[in-house]
Amino acid sequence: MGRTPCCDKIGLKKGPWTPEEDEVLVAHIKKNGHGSWRTLPKLAGLLRCGKSCRLRWTNYLRPDIKRGPFTADEEKLVIQLHAILGNRWAAIAAQLPGRTDNEIKNLWNTHLKKRLLSMGLDPRTHEPLPSYGLAKQAPSSPTTRHMAQWESARVEAEARLSRESMLFSPSFYSGVVKTECDHFLRIWNSEIGEAFRNLAPLDESTITSQSPCSRATSTSSALLKSSTNSWGGKEVTVAIHGSDYSPYSNDLEDDSTDSALQLLLDFPISDDDMSFLEENIDSYSQAPPIGLVSMVSKF
């Protein structure tokens, strides 16, 4: 059940008002007053709807209507009243004598609303606009809020997957390897690398001709220490091998041990057999506890 219509609207005229109709309406209201707008058309002899007569009188034919553009004070007052009353144009028009609600509505939609947008204000709330503009408003219902949450979660998941795929892609590692290669290449081309390049090269023939066994022998022979002592008119050279161990020198140490033992057995026996130990005990005390002692008799 809605509001009952003001008239039957059968055989009534529609469209713009003619000047003759305006004169009839103004003359009737000046003489009798408007009274009830439902019965006015029949009393005035107009083929118009009661609502149409009311709007025509209120918005155009009223004698106290102020004509012409709105002043700056009137526009400022409209903006202030709209912030309080919203789109209640009739209530706003009641605060501006001589201005109709239709005029104020047209003024707002054509000028004042655009002015607020250019100033960065929301025309509905008169608050500063968000940084992302009017297109992205805050969700107003639980459904829209949930949709916004799902959308943000989806965007975050896609960003995380794209980062992981970039880490596992071959192009990413090739870029890392290339960076490391460039790093070592820069070191090689620097002053440090130049110092290494200026080193004198080793003789390849010497390196290739030496076997592992010969290199071990030469190393151990470099560690030998010799001392000469006189035992009863004979010079004896005592060679002390270092304690460095080499897997290639085991056979050499066994041979030298056998030869040293044979020399001790062949050593001539004299009356003072212990003089050798008494005279050379200091030189034996200086020798390392581990090592091989070989004695070679020189005549």
UniProtKB/Swiss-Prot annotation:
GO terms for cellular component: nucleus. The keyword Cell membrane does not apply. GO terms for biological process: flower development; regulation of flower development. Residues 37-61, 89-112 bind DNA. It comes from the Eukaryota. Disruption phenotype: Meristem identity phenotype; increased number of cauline leaves and secondary inflorescences. Keywords: DNA-binding, Flowering, Nucleus, Repeat, Transcription, Transcription regulation. Pfam families: Myb_DNA-binding (PF00249). Interacts with LFY. PANTHER family: MYB FAMILY TRANSCRIPTION FACTOR (PTHR10641), TRANSCRIPTION FACTOR MYB17 (PTHR10641:SF622). This is Transcription factor MYB17. It comes from Arabidopsis thaliana (Mouse-ear cress). The gene is MYB17.
